Amino acid sequence: MDLEAAHGAAAAPGKRRRRARESWGASLLLAYQSLGVVYGDVATSPLYVYKSAFAGDDIQHSAGNEEIYGVLSFVFWTLTLISLVKYVLIVLRADDGGEGGTFALYSLICRHVRAGLLPGGAGDELAVGGRRDARAMSRLRAMLERYRVLQRLLLLFALLGTCMVIGDGVLTPAVSVYSAVSGLELSMEHEHHKYVQLPVTCAILIGLFALQHYGTHRVGFIFAPIVCVWLLCISAIGVYNIVHWNHHVYRALSPYYMYQFLKKTQTGGWMSLGGILLCVTGSEAMYADLGHFSQSSIKIAFMSVVYPALVLAYMGQAAYISQHHSFENAYHIGFYVSVPEKLRWPVLVIAILAAVVGSQAVITGTFSIIKQCSSLSCFPGVKIVHTSSTVHGQIYIPEINWILMILCLAVTLGFRNTKHLANAQGLAVITVMLVTTCLMSLVIVLCWNKSIFLALGFLIFFGTIEVLYFSASLVKFHEGAWVPITLSFIFMIVMCVWHYGTIKKYEFDFQNKVSVNWLLNLGPSLGIVRVRGIGLIHTELVSGIPAIFSHFVTNLPAFHQVLVFLCVKSVPVPHVQPEERFLVGRIGPKEYRLYRVIVRYGYRDVQKDDIEFEKDLVSSIAEFIRSGDSHHNGVLEDTDKSCEKLSSISNGIPLWMEDGEVDASASPHKETDTQIISPNRKKARFVLPKNAQVDSEVRRELQELMDAREAGMSFILGHSYMKAKSGSSFIKRIVINFFYEFLRRNSRGPSYAATIPHASTLEVGMVYQV
């Protein structure tokens, strides 16, 4: 035994080392893959940063090189402080169940503080450990929980950041592709170039958006190599320019040159900051795409590959420009002029490919954030297509895709130059960063339980830097910065109107729900004819009987033998574990055959198709019946208060299919003697554990459930028409009767309802006076 123990002790370090090597190997693989998904945008920023900073008459390149050295110093420290320190070292730690982004920060705060305005929220907040500086935190928490106006401001702030991300999804493809194609300017005659650049840019953009429905997984394997080649290319050119033109350019990394730059250029230098801040565009993607990778992989990729390559690229451009002062045209202050002439065509091709990769990442991120907003009732329902069977985050939204394409082409054709496009993108980028800084300061106090002074230090330090850039971008309102403001205003109106209407609809349902006593007093037959089958009544309520049901049975007194009130909720967490997805309860005595099922999805979860959903639903109800709910699971104990107990069903009773496959791991199970055959379905049986003690009453209820499933399942969907009640204000009538109704008529229904067979669906119309 001693020898075995000694051998085990000696082997343990070897196992730990092997696991560590495997972990590092997985992180390195993810880091490599993240180059193509996360860093395409920030990697292409050298194409237009210097060109945007020197655009117009804000600053001029002089023989003393104060301007170019000052711009390089600002670029270096902005990239270091914002991208490296703020995002990589701090913000990446604030993940919401592994997910990132502006809305993830908002949902994280709402779960720790009861500050959510979303109907049918997630319930109690998560337990938080530690109470450091509890007095200051409790005061801040109490204010957010007590004052409804602060909750609304918090939601509006999160929506502002979301709208600017959508605006960035419009502007980034235009800026990146247009800047990449601008390399043709130095490779062909000017007379030919002016007829080529715009059509080529538009053709690439149309092709980019037209191919979205194929999904990034089909060409994703080449994304990382393209970005790797691009980063290697710009860093090698940077090293060449530093060695060949000005190897003392590293001195410009000193903050002293920022002071000299502002001292000499004054107002012009401050206004040029709007172009300099584009060096950090794409930094938000590191946080937004956190769900697809890990913190360690994103940190490894940025700190070891992306950051050094970008610094070398910016230093190389500055080294070349510092030795060339006789530029005839402004476009010479840019990327391609610093590329050796023999390499311009290959670099041009790589740049265009890298710009497409960067644009793809932003477009996919826009799809993801709109899906999050739609899941949390902050955006009208849209069609969501999952383009990958393995990576759930890869989605495609047709309506949003074509809207983005039209807007992207509109700004490209409207501005026709990098200056105005860059001004527009700069304001969108810095606004999102400001929102992230403010929300992050709340996370530090409320979620991490750190000192409020630490949060204030974070807010003041990074907020001051970003406010400086924000002010420089805002003064360019008439030179392109009005575009993201206009786009965000339009999307903000859409989101606020939809959210307001959704809340009013939920409040109407809640206030007009029917008492459970009314239903129980009808008797086991509910006072109506009970026909074979399962009836699913969709409701937003987690308790009580929806008014739509009483409206239905009053006009058509017949219903199914098994009645299920189905509530599908999106909760403010990224993912809900399968064993926690279904909550099942019983309404009234067993002979009524009334059940309530609440199905919970996270804002990043993928909802199943109708066959899988129906199968899981019936299996969960069957497991609820088998588990002996009459004692403690889901019995309606206090009908006056409509207090129902719901049970979380971890694993439903699996179904044995006709071809011999079992839907769950059920090898040690035996089947009941219940068997059904349906012309439209495979025959199925419940599979019970071998040691299960099933009495005759439970077996009879399971038999009835399977008979009802054999007869068919019908979905009753409420089709509500919102009308502002008499006496409402003029603004409310406009918002509800026109704006909200317009959005409702042109939006998709619930995502699970889209997969329900039309022959099994019945819509019941009802007017809501709100």
Curated annotation (Swiss-Prot):
Pfam families linked to this entry: K_trans, K_trans_C
Regions that span the bilayer: 24-44, 71-91, 153-173, 195-215, 219-239, 268-288, 300-320, 347-367, 395-415, 426-446, 452-472, 480-500
For the biological process aspect of GO, one term held by this record is: potassium ion transport
- Which InterPro entries does the UniProt record give? K+_transporter, K_trans_C, K_trans_N
Membrane topology, record value: Multi-pass membrane protein
GO cellular component labels:
membrane
Instruction: Give me the Cytoplasmic side stretches, as residue ranges.
Output: 1-23, 92-152, 216-218, 289-299, 368-394, 447-451, 501-770
Q: Name one GO molecular function term.
A: potassium ion transmembrane transporter activity
Residue numbers on the Extracellular membrane side: 45-70, 174-194, 240-267, 321-346, 416-425, 473-479
The listed locations are: Membrane
Task: Name the keywords, alphabetized.
Answer: Ion transport, Membrane, Potassium, Potassium transport, Transmembrane, Transmembrane helix, Transport
Tell me the domain of life: Eukaryota
Where the protein is mainly located, per its record? Answer: membrane
Signal peptide range equals none
Q: What does this protein do?
A: High-affinity potassium transporter.
Q: Which PANTHER family match?
A: OSMOTIC STRESS POTASSIUM TRANSPORTER, POTASSIUM TRANSPORTER 25
Q: Which family does it belong to?
A: Belongs to the HAK/KUP transporter (TC 2.A.72.3) family.
UniProt-recorded name of the protein: Potassium transporter 25
**In which organism is this protein found?**
Oryza sativa subsp. japonica (Rice)
